[in-house]
Amino acid sequence: MENYSGAVVNNKYVETKSCEYRLTNNEMPIKLQFPSYLEQKTVQIMGKCMKVDHAVIEYRNQVPFNAKGTVIVTIRDTRLSYEQAAQAAFTFPIACNVDLHYFSSSFFSLKDETPWEIVYKVEDSNVIDGTTFAQIKAKLKLSSAKHSTDIRFKPPTINILSKDYTEECVDFWSVEKPKPIRRMLNPGPNQGPYPISGHRPIMLQPGETWATRSSIGRSSSMRYTNNDRPSILDNTSASDADYPLRHLHKLPEASLDPGDSVSQSHSNAMSKREIEDIIETTISKCLISQRSNVNKAL
């Protein structure tokens, strides 16, 4: 950031000297001049913030008559990540003299470093890399305010100074404002995995059973505190309709015993000899019945 001798808040522009730049395929910065350190501290003591009202980029080519290529000028906000720092971009032919006017849409604090960065690069050019191809001059118009306010987007202004080119030869891109999305902090009573009834699953604590925790109509909370648990379990005046399974864990084991399991019960399996006798008896009865039917037919 170079020193600037003028006042911070006025109708004048903070101008840089017209500098020559070399052709490159990589992004290179264009010099910007912001208020001096003393002027920044003066505005900071006044408790104000600042914004760039207007930025002007004056491009004057220094290339041969038949030079080809596209110049890309990008305005970046260094307060954002590198992938999302680009705020606007211009593209125009390398031989086209043009003035680019861009209007800012955000405030910045003087406690931060210079928020803006303007870079350029050249693509698809027949000019040799490293050649001094243009003079570029940047101008900024700044203003201060007690606090930030909403700024409406204002489209850029493009002044083409070369007669062989029209506005169709210049393109402009600007970043879009993200749509506001509300983020919920705590879900309400009608949200979450149990939106209809509002009931929550029973959470058992150490020393508790499902029978002691089961109740009817308790939708606000299914958890007993350490102070409330003894009174609920031992209070004989509590309604049995509210806690129908309260004393279930106190029943004797015999009342809840379903009996022996299949593996413990006596096996009724038949021996191989018994099965063979049943089969032989069945076959004999079938043969006798068939012979009786034949004799009756004769």
From Swiss-Prot:
<dbReference type="GO" id="GO:0016020">
    <property type="term" value="C:membrane"/>
</dbReference>
<dbReference type="GO" id="GO:0044167">
    <property type="term" value="C:host cell endoplasmic reticulum membrane"/>
</dbReference>
<dbReference type="GO" id="GO:0020002">
    <property type="term" value="C:host cell plasma membrane"/>
</dbReference>
<keyword id="KW-1032">Host cell membrane</keyword>
<keyword id="KW-1038">Host endoplasmic reticulum</keyword>
<keyword id="KW-0916">Viral movement protein</keyword>
<keyword id="KW-0472">Membrane</keyword>
<keyword id="KW-1044">Host microsome</keyword>
<protein>
    <recommendedName>
        <fullName>Movement protein BC1</fullName>
    </recommendedName>
</protein>
<comment type="similarity">
    <text>Belongs to the begomovirus movement protein BC1 family.</text>
</comment>
<keyword id="KW-0813">Transport</keyword>
<comment type="function">
    <text>Transports viral genome to neighboring plant cells directly through plasmosdesmata, without any budding. The movement protein allows efficient cell to cell propagation, by bypassing the host cell wall barrier. Begomovirus genome is shuttled out of nucleus by Nuclear shuttle protein (NSP) and the movement protein transports the DNA-NSP complex to cell plasmodesmata and facilitates further movement across the cell wall.</text>
</comment>
<dbReference type="GO" id="GO:0046740">
    <property type="term" value="P:transport of virus in host, cell to cell"/>
</dbReference>
<keyword id="KW-1043">Host membrane</keyword>
<dbReference type="GO" id="GO:0003677">
    <property type="term" value="F:DNA binding"/>
</dbReference>
<dbReference type="InterPro" id="IPR000211">
    <property type="entry name" value="Gemini_BL"/>
</dbReference>
<keyword id="KW-0597">Phosphoprotein</keyword>
<comment type="subunit">
    <text>Binds to dimeric supercoiled plasmid DNA.</text>
</comment>
<dbReference type="Pfam" id="PF00845">
    <property type="entry name" value="Gemini_BL1"/>
</dbReference>
<keyword id="KW-0238">DNA-binding</keyword>
